[in-house]
């Protein structure tokens, strides 16, 4: 079967998730999905990079999934942001519980009572930990795999504790750097945006978000970084003794990424044939397809096996199945395999293979004695750069700068405007059918716009902001 055109993005996305065996959507509970082995391998490869980045400065931990109602409700502003989405456990077997237990919607209220016990003295700071866990939200909106879920299966949340606001603010900048490195690794362009006051994380001093633009022009939030100031420290009594003997409330940050990063990977790079994966995160990096003719099978298979052996440092599949070559091409294109070799009888005789890359239509011959690990890694680097450039170009085409509010509603993608910090002006632009994502912390290099200008509403000094329909 062929996939729907990616121009019909919603239909394409649901079809590719199932057909390419990322997630099985047939689980009998709305908003819960099953990882196929192939999809889970992508998850492992993507998250191994995230772990590598986090492990440089953080220790990995694991906190329980059950949070007592007494703790969840302590930070009033925080729980207000989640209370209608919490799953509650009210019974242990048939016995009603004295205190209801929440299935974690996020882990601040699970972790911070323990941080109070761990942080006593300035020598305990900074504290930097992370975990990769599942979280639960009773989503009432339209659910879709990897994007809007009732069980987020792969939530990487980091939490840090610092001596003061300034040190925590410096760490926010570091966290932004971690996420930039991660998304650059995946060749996914992004916008780093400071959320409006009315859309920041409940209980935060401010929120910085990473947004990418999906093929239908809507934006997907793919990471957030929050400066919590001392708000949670006051609620959970997280204090430290300074060198002068005085006790002070700590300041905190938290930042998270979910499997939306994989939704972005699939959506940003994929095409009408299926997945297009960067080399590092492809479960199968190289496929070798023998083109067999009667009587010439042995020579072809010998050449294919030698090549597979030569490249065994990579994740290589020699497809010896009985399908015709065309069916094999279709299968491995759907799976996003970055590099394909074909060897037929004439190729084996000449000592060459025909090479093609998943992101390009062209094929070319290469002498088999020139194919080695170095050559493959060179191709992989070039492929990633092409993916990055193509994605940035497509994303830039979906952003339109406007100088009057009347144009906001007409544009199907992201609208860039200059906007002052006045809340009335912020709400005013939202009356035109799009949400205010916030203000660019930095203008991405793929967007050719100045960072400052006159507010589109009131004419005062403003900064570049983005409006969009969101997932």
Swiss-Prot record:
InterPro entries linked: aa-tRNA-synt_IIb, aa-tRNA-synth_II, aa-tRNA-synth_II/BPL/LPL, Anticodon-bd, Anticodon-bd_dom_sf, Pro-tRNA-ligase_IIa, Pro-tRNA-ligase_IIa_arc-type, Pro-tRNA_ligase_II_C
EC class (word): ligase
Signal peptide residue numbers: none
One GO MF term attached to the UniProt entry: proline-tRNA ligase activity
Record flagged with keyword Protein transport: no
BP terms from Gene Ontology: prolyl-tRNA aminoacylation
Keywords, in A-Z order: Aminoacyl-tRNA synthetase, ATP-binding, Cytoplasm, Ligase, Nucleotide-binding, Protein biosynthesis
Enzyme nomenclature, EC number: 6.1.1.15
Compartments reported by the entry: Cytoplasm
Family of this protein: Belongs to the class-II aminoacyl-tRNA synthetase family. ProS type 3 subfamily.
Name assigned to this protein: Proline--tRNA ligase
Species lineage: Archaea, Methanobacteriati, Methanobacteriota, Archaeoglobi, Archaeoglobales
């Amino acid at each position: 079967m062929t996939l729907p055109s990616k121009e019909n993005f919603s239909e394409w996305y649901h079809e590719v998730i199932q057909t390419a065996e990322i997630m099985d959507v047939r689980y009998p509970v709305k908003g819960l999905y099953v990882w196929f082995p192939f999809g889970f391998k992508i998850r492992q490869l993507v998250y191994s990079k995230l772990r590598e980045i986090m492990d440089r400065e953080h220790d990995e931990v694991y906190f329980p999934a059950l949070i007592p109602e007494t703790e969840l409700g302590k930070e009033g502003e925080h729980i207000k942001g989640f209370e209608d989405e919490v799953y509650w456990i009210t019974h242990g077997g048939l016995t009603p519980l004295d205190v209801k237990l929440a299935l974690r919607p996020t882990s601040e209220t699970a972790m911070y009572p323990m941080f109070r016990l761990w942080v006593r003295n300035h020598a305990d700071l900074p504290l930097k930990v992370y975990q990769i866990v599942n979280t639960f939200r009773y989503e009432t909106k339209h659910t879709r795999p990897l994007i809007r879920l009732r069980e987020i299966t792969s939530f990487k949340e980091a939490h840090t504790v610092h001596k003061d606001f300034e040190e925590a603010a410096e760490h926010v900048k570091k966290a932004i750097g971690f996420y930039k490195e991660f998304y650059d690794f995946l060749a996914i362009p992004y916008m780093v945006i400071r959320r409006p006051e009315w859309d920041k994380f409940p209980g935060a001093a401010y929120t910085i978000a990473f947004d990418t633009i999906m093929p239908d022009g809507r934006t997907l939030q793919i990471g957030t970084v929050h400066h919590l100031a001392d708000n949670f420290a006051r609620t959970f009594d997280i204090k430290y003794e300074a060198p002068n003997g005085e006790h002070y409330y700590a300041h905190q940050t938290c930042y998270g990424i979910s499997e939306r990063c994989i939704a972005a990977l699939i959506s940003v790079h994929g095409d009408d044939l299926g997945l297009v994966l960067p080399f590092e995160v492809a479960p199968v990096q190289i496929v070798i397809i023998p083109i067999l003719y009667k009587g010439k099978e042995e020579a072809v298979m010998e050449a294919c096996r030698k090549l597979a052996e030569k490249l065994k440092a990579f994740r290589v599949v020699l497809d010896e199945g009985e399908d015709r070559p065309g069916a094999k091409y279709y299968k491995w294109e759907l799976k996003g395999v970055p590099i394909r070799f074909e060897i037929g009888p004439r190729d084996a005789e000449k000592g060459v293979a025909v090479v093609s890359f998943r992101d390009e239509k062209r094929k070319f011959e290469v002498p088999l004695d020139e194919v080695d690990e170095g050559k493959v890694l060179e191709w992989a680097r070039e492929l990633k750069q092409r993916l990055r450039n193509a994605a940035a170009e497509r994303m830039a085409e979906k952003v339109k700068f406007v100088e009057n509010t009347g144009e906001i509603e007409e544009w199907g993608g992201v609208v860039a405007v200059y906007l002052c910090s006045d809340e009335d002006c912020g709400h005013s632009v939202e009356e035109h059918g799009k949400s205010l994502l916030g203000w660019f912390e930095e203008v991405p290099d793929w967007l050719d716009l100045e960072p400052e200008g006159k507010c589109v509403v009131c004419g005062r000094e403003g900064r570049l902001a983005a409006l969009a329909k969101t997932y």
